[in-house]
């Protein structure tokens, strides 16, 4: 099976902060091991030399990625690679991919991977547009472009049951019937970030929590900052907050200056340490190993989080707000609705060794089915 994997890399200068690239870097070799001939079309190649590379140029903004997929380049790519399966990691590009295949005279299945949902649903079923995709009121247009992409796909792959439910509901509201297209294929865990819970020691009355998520406003960073202050003031914990971006370009700061503002605020908070992996996954793993638990983001309607999986694969219990995929995936004893509940949970993790080790084992076990080989098998089954 010839697979053309179209990948938009939004953080080419900080690949370790780009979950889509990390996903491809893990999945493409596993697909190759399973017998597929994989070409990754991307600005940068993945690490395995067995995976073919077709260099592309990523759109300079998130809106160009959704509204300007570059049909001319797609037609050339289809003619050169003659794929049997095209993976569209930017769902909104699927209609352009369909048109390019038609023009190139290539008959290939289009599998859309919903790596990012530009919407979420409240507990009462209200559809909310992602504020990060709603500058100058563009959110509705992004939603419709997403729906058009779903309609153009032969297969639609999502991370979780939560994402499947939301995607189905959003499609129905825009007149798209997914039928039997939809498949749940979670992302793989990083083989470099796996630690047996048997090697973990519980904290001795004081714990270190780690927050390893991007500091965008739409990730709920202001809400996390509020919680961070409560935790370091009222629980026996200190926090490590990761700066995943480092120095960003002036263009990216102009589009969204929120990470720099939040980083500055967190850096002046007592009990909070800012750390960077400097793009090194080994250093990142060491930072995780030095922590005792992780904190999930307050991102509204979170459909999946690579950073949560990173923590759990290292045997770190992750606490999180009771919302979206987090409520589906994280153990109920570690979910909270209020800051007071979060304080009590972290106090227990810091002081109750039996409770801590139980949840370290549960965290690790929750990633057991996410090996690259297992995910590749599910992926290939979905696109056959």
Show which residues each predicted segment covers.
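Conserved donor-binding/catalytic core segment of Leloir-type glycosyltransferases
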Residues: 157, 200-219, 225-232, 240
């Amino acid at each position: 099976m010839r697979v053309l994997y179209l990948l938009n890399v939004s953080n080419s200068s900080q690949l370790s902060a780009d979950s889509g690239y990390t996903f491809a870097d893990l999945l493409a070799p596993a697909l190759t091991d399973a017998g597929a001939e994989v070409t990754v079309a991307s600005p940068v190649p993945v690490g395995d030399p067995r995976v073919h590379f077709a260099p592309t140029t990523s759109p300079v903004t998130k809106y160009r990625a959704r509204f300007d997929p570059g049909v001319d380049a797609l037609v050339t790519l289809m003619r050169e690679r003659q794929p049997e399966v095209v993976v569209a990691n930017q769902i909104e590009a699927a209609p352009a991919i369909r048109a390019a295949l038609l023009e190139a005279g290539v008959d290939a299945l289009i599998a859309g991977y919903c790596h990012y949902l530009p919407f979420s649903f409240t507990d009462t079923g209200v559809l909310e547009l992602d504020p990060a995709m709603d500058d100058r009121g563009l959110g509705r247009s992004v939603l419709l472009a997403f729906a058009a992409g779903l309609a153009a796909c032969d297969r639609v792959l999502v991370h979780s049951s939560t994402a499947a439910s939301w995607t189905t509901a959003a499609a129905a509201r825009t007149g798209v019937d997914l039928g039997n297209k939809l498949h749940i294929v979670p992302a793989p865990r990083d083989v470099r970030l796996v630690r047996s819970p048997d090697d973990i020691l519980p904290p001795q009355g004081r714990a270190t929590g780690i927050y390893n998520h991007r500091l965008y406003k739409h990730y709920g960073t202001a809400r996390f900052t509020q919680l961070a202050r409560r935790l370091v003031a009222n629980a026996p914990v200190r926090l490590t907050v990761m700066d995943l971006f480092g120095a960003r370009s002036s263009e990216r700061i102009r589009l969204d200056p929120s990470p720099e503002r939040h980083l500055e605020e967190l850096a002046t908070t007592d009990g909070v340490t800012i750390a960077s992996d400097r793009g090194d996954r080994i250093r990142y793993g060491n930072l995780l190993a030095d922590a005792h638990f992780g904190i999930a983001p307050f991102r509204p309607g979170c459909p999946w989080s690579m950073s949560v999986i990173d923590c759990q694969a290292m045997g770190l219990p992750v606490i999180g707000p009771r919302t979206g995929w987090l409520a589906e995936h994280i153990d109920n004893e570690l979910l909270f609705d209020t800051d007071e509940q979060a304080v009590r949970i972290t106090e227990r993790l810091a002081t109750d060794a039996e409770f801590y080790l139980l949840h370290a084992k549960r965290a690790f076990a929750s990633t057991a089915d996410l090996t690259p080989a297992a995910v590749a098998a599910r992926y290939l089954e979905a696109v056959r």
